[in-house]
């Protein structure tokens, strides 16, 4: 009896060991191999490795996750028109006109039309990026399911279609990466008219991107009747920027409390808002100040803070006792 129990325990140990699972996988692979001739089996394994390599390098889950994060960031960015003069012809003695000077020469009405074009182009570009990323997600899911299919025969029979899918997904990825960077704006008409004998160089319009302005949620702190706010931009601009801070009291209880709101222009990344009510909730919103070249700003960061309670009132006098100070 003891020998039989020991033997059963040993058999159980073998079944529970990793080696038994490896044997099971080998058995399953051997069963699949019996479905194909040796040459076909080698072809199947080679093509399966090609597909696995594509899914682990060119279209890995980690890569798609990074692209999703970049896509979410682009949805929070601000988009502007950037005016750049083209190079003058060789030998021209006139200097290049600086962008600030170019604004004085551009027809304002035509420029407003180009801003609308820039807005539409930016919206379309973001929609296309989302669609391309969705194609990459669905394409990877379909190929991953094909890789895990138990029967190798449909895999071999449809390899031509698989190759086409790999090529198509590579093109989609290239288009996605190329579209991540805002490009030229197509100008149908001249924005700068000829003025007398002055030679004005042709200009080109580009869409540029600025990273979103976001509150520093660790450094922004509420006190009893004031708050200290901090915000930042992930990529620091070359020149100082102007910001617009908005605040308002949530759920005002009286008409007077409805005045607890405001818009404050700020030339730094920090600001203290005073004269607030204690133990109340306020909403704060930060964005860049309005710019003549802004074409699209779909998002702005907001933060909700609650001021701390005021000091407790003194105890009420006992019945029959005069108030304090009398």
Swiss-Prot record:
> Source organism's superkingdom?
Eukaryota
Q: Which organism is it from?
A: Mus musculus (Mouse)
Q: Which InterPro entries match?
A: DUF5581_C (IPR048317), DUF5581_N (IPR049231), FN3_dom (IPR003961), FN3_sf (IPR036116), FNDC11 (IPR039581)
Q: Which residues form the Fibronectin type-III domain?
A: 212-310
- Name recorded for this polypeptide: Fibronectin type III domain-containing protein 11
Q: Name one Pfam family in it.
A: DUF5581
Top-down, what is the taxonomic lineage of the species of origin? Eukaryota, Metazoa, Chordata, Craniata, Vertebrata
Q: Where is this region: Disordered?
A: 304-326
